[in-house]
Structure formats: structure tokens, C-alpha cells
Amino acid sequence: MTKQIVLKLLREHTEEFLSGEAISRQAGVSRAAVWKAVEQLRQEGYGIESVPNRGYRLTRVTARLRPEELAEQFRDCRIGRELLCFDTIDSTNNELKRRAVSGSVDGTVILADQQTGGRGRRGRSFVSPAGKGLYLSAALRPQCPLSEISTLTAWTAVALCDAVEAVCGVRPGIKWPNDLVLNRKKLCGILTELEWEAESGEFSCVIIGAGINVSQDEADFGPEVAPIAISLAQALGTAPDRTELAARVIRSLNALYDDFPAQNAAYLECFRRDCLTVGNPIKVISGAGERIGTATGISDDFGLTVRWEDGSTETLTSGEVSVRGLYDY
């Protein structure tokens, strides 16, 4: 606890030195305890400058995820009141599924520094190198008809756009139905999965998973993924603090949970505004083969309306097709 108080004080005074005596007084601990906390923070990767007769100043935050900071922020919130962080895991969605079997996970958040089996829609793999992305899943149990839960993927896309914009000052676009895009490349993938009670067959929870590319470079993505993927560091020239981004994502998900499903019109308006697929030629890949058309709009239930080459129209749902832009990503 002392370490977190010292860090909080240093973060509040980054433009000036804070004396050991002042920290000791405000934290209610001894000077020796302050020194010990500073050394612990340095070992975790924080840059802390110390000058005799002036004190301490925070010069760099650690690149590591800091789950203790997140836990402190969200202990009284619907989402994040239980927050678990793993160094390495197969998949944050999978971990929530395992926990759902043994009891309620409503509001639980799983974070990981690395995923060895990250995945997206239709079983596709999601490259999740250690320390380079934000890999997060949350479990929700909304009180609404099951028919409305299908819109949560689109709602989540809007919420994540809000989070990235708040931290980075740039708003991604949305590639229907579940990708965030910057500079015509994939920045983030979203995977929502429903879980059911094993014995009763009743709805248990919906798991929302998100993977945001934060500091990857081309080598991290690999030759197959690099041409269609981008990280915030590549797009902006610098990577945001992952813990700050995680906090904003969880905050946006809490707002989503509070709004769902009553504020559907507001989220629909945002989704229509942010969707980059509309107005562009697309290739639709389904079990029946491939078709070429033009995306003409988003329906009231977040479906994609398409005009085919023969002039006919159709509204697609997220579960039945894969949509690829004909140009770039």
C-alpha cells in the first residue's frame, strides 16, 4: 500500500521535486519506508530522479501493466471490481470461460501481458506478443432479452474508439463488424462470446474480449500480418501507457454496461459515424462463396446493408459472413 501511495504522490507532482519529508508526512509512513517504496518502484521500471535536499521526481512510468493501480480505481465499479492480471495466458476469453464454470464472473476483468492462443472471430489467431499490446476480457450479465445481446460487439467497438481517443487524441474508425482501424490497417480486434450454464442450459454471461496493438513493430506482427496491422506506436510515433489505456477501456466498458441496452440509439449513431466500411466496395466471403458489392449503410440492429453487383440488396449480420475491403484492409 505504501508503494502505491508514494507512486500516486509522485504522479501528482511530475513537474517538481517532492521531498522525502513531504512524502512521509502525506503518506503517514517513515522516511525509511518512503526510500524502500521508491526502490521497489525503480525495480519495476519506473524512472525516479532523486536529488539531495530536493527530493524525488517521477521521470518515466513503467511499461509493465500495473494491475494494482487498476484494482484501486475500479474496486467499486460494476466492471473491474474483480481484476486479475497474468504474465502469460492462452487467452483472456478462455480464462473467463474457465472461471464461469465455477461461479459468477459478472464484472470480472482478465488482463494479460502475453497471449499464446489469442484468437478472433471464426477461430482466427490474434498475434499477442509480450509487453506490446493490451489484451483484455470482461464478463457481463446484462438484464435484457438475448436477442439484444448480439449488438454488444458493435457497442464495444464504439466504447473502444472512445477509449483510444481519450488517451491518444485520435479516433479510430470501425471496420464492420468488429475491428478498429487506423490508417486503413487493423488496430484492434473484438471477440464477444456467450456462455451457457452446463446443467440448465440457461444463459450465464457474455464475454467481451479486446486486443489493442500498442507498441508492436513489423517484426512483432510477422510478414503475413504486418501489411494489414498497425500499432498505436506506428500510427502516432509513440506508444501510450498501457495501464492508462487499460483504465480508459474499463471505464468505457462501465459506461457501456450502464447504458445497455437503453441507449441503443446513441451508440447506433456513433457506430454509423465511425464505420469505414459504409460507402466502399466489399468482398463478402461466406459458406456459399464470394460476392462483390457495395456497403450502403448500417441497419437499426447494426447489420450491414449491401447492394450487390446485380442491383439487389441485402442486410448482413455479423455472424454469417466475413467482410474484406477490396482496397487495402
What kind of region is each of these model predictions?
Residues 2-166, 188:
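N-terminal lobe of the biotin/lipoate ligase/transferase fold
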Residues 3-8, 20, 26, 106, ...:
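Catalytic beta-strand/loop module used to bind and position nucleotide/cofactor moieties
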